[in-house]
Amino acid sequence: MRLHKRLKQNKSLLPSNSTILLAISGGQDSMALLKLIIDLKRLHKWQVEIWHGNHQWHSKSEKTEEELKLWCLKNQISFHSNKADKKEVANEEKARDWRYKNLIMKAKFLSSKNIHFPCTRILTGHTATDRAETVIMNLARGTDLTGLTTLKEQRTIESNIDLTRPLLIFNRNETLEICKDFNLPIWIDPSNENINLTRNKIRKEILPILNSIYKGADSRIASVANRLESYNEDQKLFAKIAIQFCQGEKINSLSRIKLFGLTNSIRQIILSNWLKTMGVKRITALQIEEINTKVSQRKPPGSIHLHGDFLIRWNKEAIYISNKTN
């Protein structure tokens, strides 16, 4: 089994003798994930817990939650759920934050209930296809290297809690085959059919064209993102050292004079990573290019406003960043 082989290669992904919390929507990807994890449960001595987030986005939300709950009870799988307030999930970003907030709270609760089987892993059903969609979307928006390495296999989201995506080695066609082979129920989310949403348009219209031209294009795009991830980690380490070298007199500043002595591409890497370490969550490659151009040698003092009430300003000697909320 492919997942079992991957877990043997990287034992830290899903440690044995622990509780793992699966985010299950009821769609084909999450149901395939649930089946694969349940099959490996006894071998790895896992306590498997299910969490379902009811966004109440459509008329079938309640029915999906109830049917999924009954299916889990029938199969002796522990089930948990939360219902969202409409204000909490007004858009996809808020909905994602709501899901992770509730998943983290549930993981902490499960750990407190069983200290011998702590819940240190939260699993989602993201696949290679999801990763390819994200790469295409970020490329179209304009991104730096970090934007091409999103949807990592594992990342820490809270102290002692990692978000793990075991299905990145599968594409969406393969998760559908798993569901068919094992006669698993699938609950369709109507919101995934709305092509006015960017990701859905990529999923329904763009990726199928790429896959028809180059069979398995989604998996190969995801594979490129995986290879770039390693390169990106090396770049971050380099940037950390470079930022220390270019540190200004104040903690929220960089020496503009030191930046002058570096190449254009290195300056952009330093600026991008510095802004992220200072708390700027949304920054495009075009914005980095604009900042880099405006702070280059012989350019006059100035300022630029960024997302999240951040302000970058510069004079002859240094570049500063501040936030109105601080």
UniProtKB/Swiss-Prot annotation:
Keywords, alphabetical: ATP-binding, Cytoplasm, Ligase, Nucleotide-binding, tRNA processing
MF terms (GO), sorted A to Z: ATP binding; tRNA(Ile)-lysidine synthase activity
Primary site of residence: cytoplasm
Gene Ontology CC entries for this record: cytoplasm
CDD domains: TilS_N
Group of enzyme by EC: ligase
Entry EC no(s): 6.3.4.19
Residue stretches in coiled coil: none
Gene Ontology annotations of biological process type: tRNA modification
SUPFAM superfamilies: Adenine nucleotide alpha hydrolases-like
Pfam families attached to this UniProt entry: ATP_bind_3
Subcellular location: Cytoplasm
Binding-site positions, ATP: 25-30
Catalytic reactions on record: cytidine(34) in tRNA(Ile2) + L-lysine + ATP = lysidine(34) in tRNA(Ile2) + AMP + diphosphate + H(+)
Domains: entry comment: The N-terminal region contains the highly conserved SGGXDS motif, predicted to be a P-loop motif involved in ATP binding.
Purpose of the protein: Ligates lysine onto the cytidine present at position 34 of the AUA codon-specific tRNA(Ile) that contains the anticodon CAU, in an ATP-dependent manner. Cytidine is converted to lysidine, thus changing the amino acid specificity of the tRNA from methionine to isoleucine.
Family (UniProt): Belongs to the tRNA(Ile)-lysidine synthase family.
HAMAP family, per the entry: tRNA_Ile_lys_synt (MF_01161)
Name used for this protein in its record: tRNA(Ile)-lysidine synthase
